[in-house]
UniProtKB/Swiss-Prot annotation:
It is found in: Cytoplasmic vesicle, Secretory vesicle; Secreted. One of its GO terms (cellular component) is transport vesicle. A motif (Cell attachment site) lies at residues 35-37. This is Savignygrin (-). Expressed in salivary glands.
Length: 82
């Protein structure tokens, strides 16, 4: 009985730690800009390949993607990275 309680507590703690560090917007595709003369909005994005924040843009007509941050500080705060 006591072993079951310890296993349950360990699993609960593991799930809590995993959920706390999860930032879904950081897992979205990075911003890669627009083609031609389309209206673009510039900002910051988290690049999973490099593991850091970089400048990027998105086409305004498609709406704001989830992996968009107004500043480098906002990006680093949400996703970490260099």
């Amino acid at each position: 009985m006591q072993a079951n309680i310890f296993v349950f507590a360990f699993l609960l703690l593991s799930v809590a730690v995993a959920a706390y560090g999860y930032q879904p917007e950081c897992l979205e595709p990075s911003l890669y800009g627009c083609r031609g003369d389309e209206d673009a909005t510039f900002g910051w994005t988290f690049d999973r390949e490099d593991g850091g924040c970089r400048q990027g843009s998105y086409c305004t007509r498609f709406g704001q993607p989830k992996n968009y941050f107004r500043s480098e500080g906002d990006c680093k705060k949400a996703c970490g990275g260099a």
